[in-house]
Amino acid sequence: MNSKFILKYFILAFFLVSCQTYQIAYDRFSQVLDSQYDIGVNYSRDGIFKSVISIKYDKLKNKREYFILVRVESRNSSQIKPEKIITDTRFEAKGELVSEDSKRVVYYNDFYDSYFPYDYTTVITEKNIKVEIYKFIISESEFIRFVALGNDNIAAFRIYAFRNDVIVSFNKIPFKKFLDDFNSKVKLLGGS
């Protein structure tokens, strides 16, 4: 009976750890604790938005940096440049382009034969997809107000892009677990 209980507990613990939506890593060379909390994916008329909240702690400077990263995939990047975000606490942050890349995606029909990949009749569409990552810096006081547990457990922000507005929301309760985990790792490094 005792071994079954331990096995069930081990499986449950493994499942909970594997389902985490965040990552925290420490780089010993630069002495920076970096974290990312995955909020999820939102779709608009012209593209796909993937949002991540990131907190960095620099041990040498004893300083934290809070920001939201937005990854945008679109077929026409001139139509979908995130200009700013506004949180539900009315904080506004301007976007800064961090990285851009493009990739070619080819969709094939059901009769596609991998032995003859150059058969032009099997291609349905080809798309050149632009991938851009934007960074929105948030001050520490505004960030704490934004994620503080209050009357409701949902935090939200709106991404304003050219002809595309997307509302992104997330639950504050699992986010608080991520924040507590990050703060405990900062304390282990001797920070406050």
From Swiss-Prot:
Residues 1-18 form the signal peptide. It is found in: Cell membrane. It is a lipid-anchor. Disulfide bonds: none annotated. Keywords: Cell membrane, Lipoprotein, Membrane, Palmitate, Plasmid, Signal. A lipid is attached at C19 (N-palmitoyl cysteine). One of its GO terms (cellular component) is plasma membrane. This is Uncharacterized lipoprotein BBD10. It comes from Borreliella burgdorferi (strain ATCC 35210 / DSM 4680 / CIP 102532 / B31).
